[in-house]
Amino acid sequence: MSLSGGRSSDRPIILERIRSAILATYIVFTHESTQDQQELDLYQDKVGATIAGHPLKVLAAYGPQEALEGDGPEGVVIVEFPSADAARAWYDSPAYQAIVQHRVKGGRFRAVLVEGV
């Protein structure tokens, strides 16, 4: 279906799909606390292999930080993807899902997908 044709009720869905496919999207991981360093070490050893074939760029990883409001996390990782679809493809990939258990067992984290503007 073309963007100029079809039912007008389809247009918001089509436009949202286009928007999702072209806007930079970020996954922000905040490491709130550590429960099991060995599990986190396993995750760290394996996460690099999950990147192959995925268009992503690590923008920040456990660098210096300053909490402007509230308590600061132990660490922050910000990963950029070319689209929300690309971000979900990596996060939902069998390779990443096979290791995410180590991060979850190793500490308290937040993972947030944020679309750019």
Task: Place the predicted regions along the sequence by residue.
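Intrinsic, low-complexity polybasic segments
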Residues: 2-7
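Short S/T/G/P-rich N-terminal loop/turn motif that feeds into the first structured element of a domain
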Residues: 13-75, 82-92, 115-117
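C-terminal structural segments of small proteins and small subunits
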Residues: 88-112
